[in-house]
Structure formats: C-alpha cells, structure tokens
Amino acid sequence: MAIKIVGDPLPNIPWEDRPADARGVVWRSARNPIIPRDLLPTSNSIFNSAVVPYKGAFAGVFRCDDTARNMQLHAGRSQDGITWELEPERIHFACKDTDCDCAEVNRWVYGYDPRVVWIEDRYYVTWCNWFHGPTIGVGYTYDFETFYQLENAYLPF
C-alpha cells in the first residue's frame, strides 16, 4: 500500500517506522516522553496535542499542569520536533474585537486539550475552556507569540 500525504511536504517531520511488534494504527515514538513532565520549573505534567509545522520548524500550544494541577496553555517551539522550548508563562490572550468585553471573555479559569489548525492566514487555536461552565475556547495567532481570543464557540447554557 502506498502512502499518500495530502498537503505540503514535511521533509523534517521526525518520523519513525512502525516497530515490527506494533499492531495498532498509531504507534508511540521510541523516544517518549518527547517532552518531560517537568520541563518547566512549575509543571507537574505537559501534554503535546497541538503541534504544527511553522517556518521550517515546529510550534504548538501545550497543556501544562502545575503542581496544584491548574491547567494552563503554553506556547512552545522546536527546530526538530523532538527538543522543545516552552514559554514559562501561560498564554495571555489579547482581544481585538471592540464589540466584546475583553475582561469578561478573557477571564481565565482553565484550559486543556488544545488543537491548532492553519486556516487562510493564521493559526486557529481551540481548547476546552471555562466560561460560566465548560465551553470551547477559540483564538488565533500569526506568530505563536501574540494570541487573540474570540468569543467562545459554545456557551454552557
């Protein structure tokens, strides 16, 4: 069976062939954990579910739980997709929309399970958010340095 990738080539993706004894559709890297749970001085665990190619390297948004298990979102970068540098401070979302109440929309309680996708001219970020109850947070970035939050996708009522 031939492998067909739909999209731009990713010649620098850190690919590993399926181990001979692997039976599943997906297999884990032999180098796991890629990001150690305590990479940041305050982190108890780090989850890397939102990595994308960015300017010939990789960038992403990561859930980092501190030792009190507060769930925060942090930006990170890697040249090779294996060795990562994460921002020590959580993402603080800005608000460009003058029609929304930025203080209310950006009130942070928790964030987890982020995803990142490129659409047109920016990277959109979605995550499990809290806004008067569980909801889906939506934001975007152009550069993985400044992040803008939009209205939540689903209100919890």
Can you annotate each of these PLM segments?
Residues 1-109, 117-157:
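Beta-rich carbohydrate-recognition and catalytic domains
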Residues 113:
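Beta-strand-rich binding-surface signature
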